[in-house]
Amino acid sequence: AFAFSDRRLKRNIKRVGTHVLGVGIYEFDMAGYRQRGVIAQELEAVRPDLVKRHDSGYLMVNYGAL
């Protein structure tokens, strides 16, 4: 399933690891919660098929396919 993962929506971003695809894994604040995941802009550079643009203009990641 796709979920919002655009860098512009995240605050207090801290890199905590590296995904097997070579992109960073981050902890960040988004939508009022501390979360963990990738940044869509980084993932789009290596796997554009896992990223789509929402009607709002923000990028979403298919976390189910990661």
Predicted features by range, described:
Residues 1-66:
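C-terminal intramolecular chaperone/autoprocessing and neck/assembly modules of extracellular spikes
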